[in-house]
Swiss-Prot record:
A motif (Nuclear localization signal) lies at residues 41-55. A motif (Bipartite nuclear localization signal) lies at residues 3-20, 201-248. This is Capsid protein. Homomultimer. Binds to single-stranded and double-stranded viral DNA. Interacts (via nuclear localization signals) with host importin alpha-1a. GO terms for cellular component: host cell; host cell nucleus; T=1 icosahedral viral capsid. Keywords: Capsid protein, DNA-binding, Host nucleus, Host-virus interaction, Metal-binding, T=1 icosahedral capsid protein, Viral penetration into host nucleus, Virion, Virus entry into host cell, Zinc, Zinc-finger.
Length: 257
């Protein structure tokens, strides 16, 4: 077979099949004769090596299981109705009992990969008739050195004129408390522009590594490192707000237990 000359070899465009394999997504490839679902599964980006995936997958990748942990993914829920006032309230969201179930920790160490806060804030019949606007400030805080009982909102945060919207962690506590996430929700009372309830739905990835002592009970006092606390406070001084929340954490056990 005679060889092609230089002009023919380098001026002929690349074949369509090769161009598609190089630049297009696998889902845009033409279906071959006698193709089966296994071939479509084999062409997905998730089943290809990292060097053959698009650049997006190489830059923004995160493992399903946190570093130093093992599956399965466990879950723990905290469901309660809270009375949120101007002075604030705090709850610990890493209270997990030691055990062998899907909602228990197997040892002292586990990692909270993500947290989901869902529910609503609302006003009762007597408060929603008053003309006012009330905003609830939520702050998810990491306590690096838990001890005793959780500190109150005013003990952790420095506020100007006792206003929760101006709350910042006190200077002498910044090495212990870290605000991981913060969000807010607003309700309005009155006769005309009334909004008596507001939906709260927040999902955050935190990757917080929690350490317990040798005790089995799910208590704040049994934490030794990195407890997660949810602080809540409303901006109105005289009208409280009720919060019906379901807080769910997704965590993995550490391989060093």
């Amino acid at each position: 077979m005679p060889k092609r000359n230089y002009d023919t070899a380098f001026s002929t465009p690349m074949s369509n099949v090769r161009r598609r394999l190089t630049f297009d997504t696998p889902l845009s490839l033409p279906a071959t004769a006698g193709s089966v679902p296994a071939s479509a599964k084999r062409r997905r980006w998730t089943n290809r090596p990292m060097w053959r995936k698009p650049r997006y997958y190489r830059l923004y990748r995160s493992p399903d299981v946190p570093r130093g942990c093992e599956g399965p993914c466990k879950v723990q829920s905290f469901e309660a109705k809270h009375d949120i006032s101007h002075v604030g309230k705090v709850i610990c969201v890493t209270d997990v009992t030691r055990g062998m179930g899907i909602t228990h920790r197997v040892g002292k160490r586990f990692c909270v990969k993500s947290i989901w806060v869902t529910g609503k804030i609302w006003m009762d019949e007597n408060i929603k008739t008053k003309n006012h606007t009330n905003t609830v400030m939520f702050k998810l805080v990491r306590d690096r050195r838990p001890f005793g009982t959780p500190q109150d909102f005013g003990q952790v945060f420095n506020m100007y004129d006792n206003e929760p919207s101006t709350a910042t962690v006190k200077n002498d506590l910044r090495d212990r408390y870290q605000v991981v996430r913060k969000f807010q929700a607003t309700v309005t009372g009155g006769q005309y522009a009334s909004k008596e309830q507001a939906i709260v739905s927040k999902f955050y990835r935190v990757n917080n590594y929690v350490v317990y002592n040798h005790q089995e009970a799910a208590k704040y006092e049994n934490h030794t490192e990195n407890a997660l606390l949810l602080y809540m406070a409303c901006t109105h001084a005289s009208n409280p707000v009720y919060a019906t929340l379901k807080i769910r954490i997704y965590f993995y056990d550490s391989i060093s237990n």
